[in-house]
A protein has these predicted regions:
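Conserved serine/cysteine hydrolase catalytic core
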Residues: 209-275
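Conserved acidic catalytic loop of the alpha/beta-hydrolase fold
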Residues: 100-119
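A short loop-to-beta-strand scaffold at the N-terminal edge of the catalytic core in hydrolase folds
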Residues: 23-33
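Catalytic histidine-centered segment of alpha/beta-hydrolase-like enzymes
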Residues: 288-298
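Conserved hydrolase catalytic core segment
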Residues: 118-159
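Conserved alpha/beta-hydrolase catalytic His-Asp/Glu region
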Residues: 176-230
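Catalytic histidine neighborhood in serine/cysteine hydrolases
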Residues: 276-290
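Conserved HGGG/HGGXW glycine-rich cap/lid loop of the alpha/beta-hydrolase fold
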Residues: 32-89
């Protein structure tokens, strides 16, 4: 884990943006690091059942690196996708889909641009967050994505991984302590790669909410599992074909971080991503599956260098 993890630091700022949905509106939370007046914004978006605080170490490191390199200040924004973390839940479970998520992020970008004109926009997306990034990178945004980081995700998601998601997504559990919750999460997250107990506890503490009786549960709407369980192989294949069309429209420099042991993203898919669309650069993380947590210094440095935030 990065040495920055040991430095005392203030918590990031928490804010909200109102986003439309089929039943009205909902509030989406986002965490901000760095200078709110910065014109260079890096958006980091998490995986399916995670939340924005997954990027604490990466965000702190990127902000510090820009300062150390005497580069213009940056702002790192890490949203909680609707239904996760501090964001509100949707009334209709079937509204948890990528069109909704991408629309929410477009609203967020519009809000950030109104606060301070964005001149440079970069995107770091883990798994689901990477798919959202691909959808936006293929669109003519007011400020186009300058550089796109896809963390162990592409147009192809293996059917075995989808079956695995069907088994656990939506099971928020009930735990008597943070340690109990962390232990349970580790059982389904070992593919994230080696972490010390301290590192894993740090990643877990923002993943739980307190119930009325004092017990803990995972901090997301169990209903996000409903559309996951509704996915058939035919729907998955159609989604894959559509995402390849999206990927082929991406023109910005793209970095694919690939967990060498990933069950979700195959080597053949990685090779196709190197040949199609933006012809992604690939950084392979040995000993890690789906997905690298971007909390260890070697992983952080890959992102830092691709975004040009190193001395």
């Amino acid at each position: 884990m990065s040495e920055l993890a040991l430095d005392p630091v203030l918590d990031p700022a928490l804010d909200f943006v109102s986003c439309p949905d089929p039943n009205g509106t909902h509030r989406m939370a986002y965490w901000s690091w760095g200078e709110s007046s910065a014109s260079h914004v890096v958006v980091c978006v998490h995986g399916l059942t995670r939340q924005g605080r997954d990027f604490d170490l990466l965000a702190r490191s990127l902000v510090a690196s820009a300062k150390k390199a005497n580069l213009p200040a940056i702002r790192v924004v890490c949203p909680d996708v609707v239904g996760r973390g501090q964001s509100e839940w949707l009334k209709d479970p079937m509204a948890y889909h990528f069109a909704q998520y991408a629309g929410d992020m477009a609203v967020l970008l519009q809000s950030l641009h109104a606060q301070q004109a964005i001149e440079r926009l970069d995107w770091v997306g883990t798994s689901m967050g990477g798919v959202i990034g691909m959808l936006l990178a293929a669109q003519p945004l007011p400020t186009p994505i300058r550089r796109l980081v896809l963390n162990d995700i592409g147009p192809v998601v293996s059917w075995a991984s989808i079956l695995n998601m069907k088994n656990y997504v939506g099971k928020v559990g009930r735990f008597q302590s943070l340690q109990d919750a962390a232990n349970a999460m580790w059982e389904i997250s070992k593919s994230f790669g080696p972490h010390t107990s301290e590192e894993w506890l740090a990643l877990s503490k923002h993943m739980v909410r307190t119930l009325e009786d004092g017990a803990l549960a995972l901090h997301y709407d169990p209903a996000i599992g409903v559309p996951v369980r509704a996915v058939t192989q035919e729907k998955a294949q159609a989604g894959e074909a559509a995402l390849w069309q999206v990927y082929d429209l991406i023109a910005c420099p793209t970095l694919l971080i690939h967990g060498a042991l990933s069950e979700l993203l195959s080597l053949s898919a990685v090779q196709d991503m190197q040949q199609r669309g933006p012809r992604a650069q690939v950084a392979t993380i040995q000993g890690v599956g789906h997905a690298p947590t971007l909390t260890h210094e070697d992983q952080i440095d890959i992102v830092r260098r691709f975004l040009g935030l190193h001395a």
